[in-house]
Structure formats: structure tokens, C-alpha cells
Amino acid sequence: MPLILDQGCFVSESRFHRLAQNIKQGSRREREQKPLINDKIGFNEFILIDENGSNLGTVRRTDALKMAEEKQLDLVLIGSNPAKPIVKLLDFGRYTYDLKRKKRQSKKNQTIIQIKEVVVKPTIAKHDLEFKAKQTTGWAEKGYHVKFVVRAFGRVSTRIELIEKVFNDFYLLVEPAVEVQKPLTASSKTMYSALLVPRKK
């Protein structure tokens, strides 16, 4: 089954979709939780930061509202600690625009790498190995990473030379398209795996 690499962790596709749904729901909650502005701010006094970043000290809400009206700006609650609420004078429209722009940029910078999986036995037939190699090459050309897994049961699990041979034979077939990011290592007594990534051109 294809796997997803998300922030350094391997998760199944079904779990990935659940995570994506949770992210969407979280984003929806974020949109609903807009910052308190102007007369929606419930504190009678708060520390006021002006539009230039200067700390004006503790100011009464009525005075701050007058100041905001005179400057054609908004009061935005940026620190809601009841013992020390902090409010800033700014253009709320511009403020929300900048926040959305930063979020969009952050999403662009995020990368989700999909990982395909190839599972073989040490005794796999040559034509089957060639088919899986061709499949892997196609995935690599599309940018996928490939997890190569060798399952060895019974006495074959102790034949390390056979396990290494099947990997080496496979790698010779796919080497033009991929390189080894994680070498073949034992995941359990009966399973060995390696991680292959598209070769940089």
C-alpha cells in the first residue's frame, strides 16, 4: 500500500486523508476564531501598542477607541492574558490580508512526499523482479520515493546473502532512476527494507 511521508513520519494513506480532514477542520475553526477588535474587546484597560510599535502603557478602552477613530485605525487584541491584555493600533483590513498571504506562502513551502512500496521475496523470479523494477522507475520519474521491502520467512530469513542479492539485482535495474537514501536494513527478523529516492539530474 502506498505510504505518505509527512514531516518525517510514515503514515498510511487512510490516515493521511484523516489528517488532511483534521487540518481542514482546524482551518475552519481558525477562520471562526477571529481576533477581537474595537468595541468587541471586553477589557476596560489594556496595554496599548501604537501603529509604529511604541508601547503607550496602560490605556482606558474609551480613550483607545477615540484614538483609533482619530487615526482611522482599529484596535486589535493581540494578547488576551486577563492580567496583562495587550492591544495594538493597526489597519485591520491590511492585518488580515497579510496573515492570509503568510498562510498561503507557508502552504506553498510545505512538501508532502508520497512513498510507494515494493515487496519481494528473496526467491522472486527474474521476470517478476524486472516488472517491479520497471514499475519503480515509473514512480521515480513521477517524483515518488520507493520503499523496497524483502520478506524472508523460514530458513530463508537466515540467508542474508540471498536477501542482499535480491536487493542488489533490483538496484542494478533501477539505478539510472533512483539512488539509495536509506540502505537495506533489518526491520524485523523476517523483513528488510531500503528507501530509494529519485536520482537528482
UniProtKB/Swiss-Prot annotation:
Its biological purpose: IF-3 binds to the 30S ribosomal subunit and shifts the equilibrium between 70S ribosomes and their 50S and 30S subunits in favor of the free subunits, thus enhancing the availability of 30S subunits on which protein synthesis initiation begins.
Keyword entries, A-Z: Cytoplasm, Initiation factor, Protein biosynthesis
NCBIfam families with a match to the protein in the record: infC
Principal subcellular localisation of the protein: cytoplasm
Organism encoding this protein: Mycoplasma pneumoniae (strain ATCC 29342 / M129 / Subtype 1) (Mycoplasmoides pneumoniae)
Gene Ontology molecular function: ribosome binding; translation initiation factor activity
Residue stretches spanning the membrane: none
Protein name per Swiss-Prot or TrEMBL: Translation initiation factor IF-3
GO biological process: ribosome disassembly
Domain of life assignment: Bacteria
Underlying gene: infC
